């Protein structure tokens, strides 16, 4: 996942490291890896690459409590062992390359290496939560690498006459497959944080598959695109089954009956298009641990993936700059945490100072500042009164004082009213674009000012032209909209 393909994301609400570490230790695959690491000893034999020799897999599976009659038990044990080795929970000494077949074992045996609990195993019980999470992230990388590998059936189909894998026939590119899975997880993360930033939203598999396949701006998908969505769904169904045991996701697989239909004669597009019961087509949810893990990988890739609360120790300038790009609810949560750790009067003074500026981001900073001031009580009044005479802040200061029933609030000059109107609409345009509510706001702000558009074009605000052009498009009163367009023309003519 690249930083270029993912601009600043909404903030995610993470559980504490202690809670996440408990989740990691409870993830089935990680827990099995820990148990096998403790099981490893002098009698443990490994082959080249550190894998358990085949005749020890039944004993490993039995130690894990897996059903001996389950044909997948040996595979589960092998995967858990590989995770233990890759994370450093187990140290292996591979067989010497020139070892004689009769060296370490009986005559005719393949040479083998040895294994023992690794130094990192102690971190599971004696390490800090961050140590446990570091081990879990290493385990996650192993599982992600496995999930990007074709399944056994595809590998068998790609064998040539000599028993070697024909990669051209397989049409498998390791880098491409890893990039695909990275993008899937990044999209899943984005879909999750866009709705509040918590791990409680299930995403239908067709929605996630479509996000990978359907071109931006496409209206009705073509049959060819729907078939690509169906293929992507089947691919993701297999991958999420592999990712669930490490605790990354909660996954409801595609209904087996639908899988059978897809394998028979049902049109492939129908698999993605039928909305009768979307849950039958698979549902996936990033767990709290999954949100943590994917965010950590995105940060390593240079993606700006903020977390709620990480601005609490920074200044008001950093706070307002950051929350200006957040959805309103996420901004509110971040502001509340920032305010909670400060003296209200000092916090308000710092916020007002940071809200100044005639740059492009100024209106939205002042909107978020106003959002923060709503949390302050009477103790903030002196700091608010101190900016009453300022063109940029005097308007919002009067609004706050009026809302709090303060006495002796001076009436604003007409120029300040016009300036505040432009600033308010500019902030709304920057925050949400041309929403359905914006025309009503425009009507409300201009209704009580006779000759509003005869005056507002003279306002010395960097967004005057942009605001008037928007009012010309959106104002619900056609006469007022025409006046706004004329005012925008006058405002443009004043610019050098």
Please describe what each predicted stretch is:
Residues 337-339, 399-445, 451-452:
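Alpha-helical adaptor scaffolds
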Residues 325-329, 360-363, 391-395, 446, ...:
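Alpha-helix N-cap/helix-start positions at coil->helix boundaries
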Residues 71-86, 228-255:
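Short amphipathic alpha-helical interaction segments
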Residues 240-242, 316-317, 344-356, 377-388, ...:
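Amphipathic alpha-helical scaffolding segments comprising HEAT/armadillo-like alpha-solenoid repeats
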Residues 210-213, 321-325, 331-342, 353, ...:
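Structural detector for internal amphipathic alpha-helices that build alpha-solenoid repeat scaffolds
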Residues 242, 248-309:
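C-terminal engagement modules used by replication, chromatin/transcription, nuclear envelope/ESCRT
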């Amino acid at each position: 996942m690249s930083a270029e393909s993912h601009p600043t994301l909404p903030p995610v609400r993470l559980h504490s490291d202690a809670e996440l570490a408990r989740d990691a230790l409870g993830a089935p695959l990680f827990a099995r890896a820990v148990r096998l690491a403790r099981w490893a000893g002098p009698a443990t034999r490994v082959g080249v690459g550190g894998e358990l020799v085949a005749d020890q897999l039944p004993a490993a599976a039995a130690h894990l409590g897996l059903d001996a009659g389950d044909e997948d038990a040996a595979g589960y044990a092998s995967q858990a062992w590989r995770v233990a080795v890759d994370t450093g929970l187990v140290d292996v000494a591979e067989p010497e390359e020139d070892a004689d077949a009769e060296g370490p074992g009986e005559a005719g045996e393949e040479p083998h290496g040895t294994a023992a609990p690794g130094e990192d195993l102690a971190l599971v019980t004696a390490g800090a939560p961050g140590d446990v999470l570091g081990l879990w992230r290493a385990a996650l990388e192993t599982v992600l690498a496995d999930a990007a590998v074709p399944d056994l059936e595809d590998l068998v189909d790609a064998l040539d006459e000599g028993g070697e894998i024909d990669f051209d026939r397989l049409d498998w590119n390791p880098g491409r497959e890893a990039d695909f899975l990275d993008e899937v997880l990044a999209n899943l993360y984005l879909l999750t944080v866009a709705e509040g930033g918590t791990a409680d939203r299930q995403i239908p598999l067709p929605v996630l598959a479509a996000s990978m396949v359907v071109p931006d701006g496409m209206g009705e998908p073509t049959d060819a695109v729907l078939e690509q969505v169906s293929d992507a769904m089947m691919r993701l169904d297999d991958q999420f089954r592999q990712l669930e045991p490490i605790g990354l996701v909660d996954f409801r697989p595609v209904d087996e009956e639908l899988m059978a239909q897809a394998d028979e004669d049902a049109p492939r597009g129908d698999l993605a298009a039928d909305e009768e019961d979307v849950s039958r087509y698979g549902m996936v949810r990033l767990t709290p641990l999954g949100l943590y893990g994917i965010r950590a990988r995105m940060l390593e890739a240079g993606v700006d993936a903020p977390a709620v609360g990480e601005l609490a120790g920074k200044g008001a300038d950093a706070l307002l700059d950051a929350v200006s790009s957040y959805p309103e609810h996420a901004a509110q949560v971040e502001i509340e945490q920032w305010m909670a750790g400060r003296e209200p009067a000092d916090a308000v003074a710092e916020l007002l100072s940071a809200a100044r500026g005639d740059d492009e981001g100024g209106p939205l900073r002042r909107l978020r500042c106003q959002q923060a001031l709503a949390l302050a009580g009477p103790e903030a009044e002196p700091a608010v009164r101190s900016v009453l005479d300022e063109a940029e802040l005097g308007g919002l200061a009067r609004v706050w004082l009026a809302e709090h029933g303060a006495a002796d609030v001076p009436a604003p000059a007409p120029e300040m009213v016009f300036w505040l109107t432009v600033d308010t609409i500019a902030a709304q345009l920057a925050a949400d674009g041309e929403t359905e509510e914006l025309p009503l706001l425009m009507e409300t702000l201009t209704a009580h000012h006779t000759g509003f558009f005869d005056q507002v074009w003279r306002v010395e605000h960097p967004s005057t032209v942009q605001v008037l052009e928007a009012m010309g498009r959106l104002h619900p009163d056609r006469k007022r909209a025409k006046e706004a367009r004329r005012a925008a023309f006058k405002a443009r003519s004043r610019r050098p």
